[in-house]
């Protein structure tokens, strides 16, 4: 699933490592999600959205072309 995690993470001034720490995952997990190589669990997706202070709809792009 495509996402805008990197965009919102950078706007928030967080490194991959800091976001990972706040979400209790590895930096490699955040990197893989940002590069569309791994789809996060629903709980992790909510944790990332909450940490970045955005909605799930803002963060993730539907594969059907919607936002």
Please identify what each model-predicted range represents.
Residues 3-22:
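Short basic helix-loop element that most often maps to the first helix and adjoining turn
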Residues 18, 29, 58:
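Residues in the helix-turn-helix
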Residues 25-38:
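Recognition helix of helix-turn-helix/homeodomain-like DNA-binding domains
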Residues 37-47, 66:
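Short, basic-rich loop-to-helix N-cap that marks the start of a DNA-contacting helix
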Residues 43-58:
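DNA major-groove recognition helix of helix-turn-helix/homeodomain DNA-binding modules
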């Amino acid at each position: 699933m495509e996402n805008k995690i990197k965009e919102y993470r950078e706007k928030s001034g967080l490194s991959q490592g800091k976001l990972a720490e706040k979400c209790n995952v590895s930096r490699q997990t955040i990197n893989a999600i940002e590069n569309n190589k791994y789809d996060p669990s629903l709980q992790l997706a909510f944790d990332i959205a909450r940490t970045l202070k955005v909605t799930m709809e803002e963060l993730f792009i539907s594969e059907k072309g919607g936002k």
